[in-house]
């Protein structure tokens, strides 16, 4: 009996190893993984953690902006902000649906959010004290989100990748809306210009933190890159965001709140 059990365990290990090799071969060939496909348990758990955190962030992200719907400076601004908050709710629902394809139910996801077991982006805990914050959030926070999320349209898990296509299109609208608010303020009175600079000062660093820890300190990046859940490292995406955002700030006449930021001639 002991020998039989030992043989069974060896055979199970061989089968599991073969399945993992076939799985990684599909990943390496850029073949998407679908819900009915075999996947390592660690891959499934990693996706649940990432997708649920993403979904929670979309839902919680409605709160600081919803706060300003009744205080928007014009009917046009109010309608645009309502549309944006509505989009964020939809993004959360798409992502919860994607997470459910991995075998976890929505009630469990929400329970983990409410009990604090699950995380969401801490940037949404920062106060929104002026209307300029609505511009800075759209421009910087949604801009950072786009930088993170566009590569997810090519992530290895099919339902997540397909959900991200629509999410990214709508986030692009949000980013343009925020930048347009900042542009209007930068062309306004001296008080409005100061308001825009103040919002930029407060949201610049939290936006950079949205890309996660540095590559050397990231616990998950290496494996997520191997599985092609992620396509680029945290530091690569953060650098791209800086390269794109600094010229936009200069066009607005704003000063980047980092005296150590310099142009790298060697990188170009």
Predicted features by range, described:
Residues 32-52, 112-138, 155, 188-192, ...:
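Acidic/His metal-coordination segments adjacent to aromatic residues that form catalytic metal sites
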Residues 7-43, 75:
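Extreme N-terminal leader/anchor segments
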Residues 37-43, 60-83, 145-160:
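Helix-loop segments that flank and shape redox-cofactor active sites
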Residues 43-54, 72-91, 134, 159-171:
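Alpha-helical scaffold segments that form or flank carboxylate-/histidine-based iron centers
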Residues 193-268:
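Extended, helix-rich structural scaffolds rather than catalytic motifs
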Residues 104-180, 198-206:
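Active-site-proximal alpha-helical scaffolds that flank and shape metal-associated catalytic sites
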């Amino acid at each position: 009996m002991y020998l039989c059990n030992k043989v069974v365990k060896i055979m199970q290990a061989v089968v599991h190893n073969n399945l993992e090799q076939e799985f990684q071969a599909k990943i390496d060939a850029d073949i998407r993984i679908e819900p009915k496909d075999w996947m390592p348990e660690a891959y499934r758990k990693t996706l649940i953690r990432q997708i649920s955190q993403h979904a929670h962030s979309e839902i919680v992200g409605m709160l600081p902006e919803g706060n300003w719907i009744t205080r928007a400076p014009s009917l046009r601004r109010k309608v645009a902000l309502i549309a944006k908050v509505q989009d964020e709710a939809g993004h959360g629902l798409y992502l919860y649906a994607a997470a459910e394809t991995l075998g976890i139910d929505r009630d469990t996801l929400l329970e983990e959010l409410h009990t604090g077991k699950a995380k969401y982006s801490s940037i949404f805990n920062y106060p929104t004290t002026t209307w300029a914050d609505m511009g800075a959030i759209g421009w910087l926070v949604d801009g950072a989100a786009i930088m993170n999320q566009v590569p997810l349209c090519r992530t290895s898990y099919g339902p997540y990748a397909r959900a991200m296509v629509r999410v990214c299109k709508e986030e692009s609208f949000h980013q343009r809306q925020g930048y347009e608010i900042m542009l209007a303020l930068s062309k306004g009175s001296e008080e409005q210009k100061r308001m825009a600079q103040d919002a930029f000062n407060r949201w610049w660093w939290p936006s950079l933190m949205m890309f996660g820890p540095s590559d050397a300190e990231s616990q998950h990046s290496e494996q997520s890159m191997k599985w092609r859940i992620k396509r680029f490292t945290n530091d690569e995406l953060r650098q791209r965001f800086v390269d794109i955002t600094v010229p936009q700030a200069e066009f607005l006449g704003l000063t980047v709140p980092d005296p150590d930021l310099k142009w790298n001639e060697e990188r170009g």
